[in-house]
């Protein structure tokens, strides 16, 4: 965790610079992040196809380029997600049929958890420590790659709750959100997977 603290400090510093940008500029920043990833991946794909004959090696090179782009964007993307959380404070919306007021500004420990998850590690957290909010950061970052992100929960209630609750953050960042329930028709499930 000590190795991650300088990155958290950078994220918090970048977040302060975002206080005066418009909501439209937030969406534009998300698009810029996507563009960086697409360019990096396309360049790696072209290079891999020209220089590598092994398909597995080509895929590795392309995924490595995507991973490197995501790591490069991580501080700015996490800062942007934190800014959206701050802006939502005081807002209310319906979550599983109940009006819910947003009052969450991510703590450093939640940002640390997001970094740990993004890097493919397990982050153990106790009840009430903000696991749902922690997931916002790596979900947003990895969704920028355009391949979709799936979060698995233990039951239908949590799937719907978390999609509706955190969905406002994702939407303000320019993402779409869907969720799957056991009772859904296959066509509806299919459209939500996209």
What is the role of each PLM region?
Residues 1-129, 133-140:
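Conserved pre-motif I regulatory segment
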Residues 14-21, 151, 179-184:
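Short, exposed beta-strand "edge-strand" segments with a Pro/Gly-rich flavor and a Y/T-containing core
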Residues 23-26, 163, 189:
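Short functional linear motifs
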Residues 80, 84, 165, 172:
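Solvent-exposed, charged/polar functional surfaces in cytosolic regulatory/catalytic domains
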Residues 114-116, 141-142, 169, 192:
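Hydrophobic/aromatic ligand-binding patch that stacks against planar heteroaromatic rings
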Residues 119-129, 134-164, 172-173, 180:
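Conserved SF1/SF2 helicase motif Ia
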Residues 167-194:
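Conserved motor-coupling elements within RecA-like helicase/translocase cores
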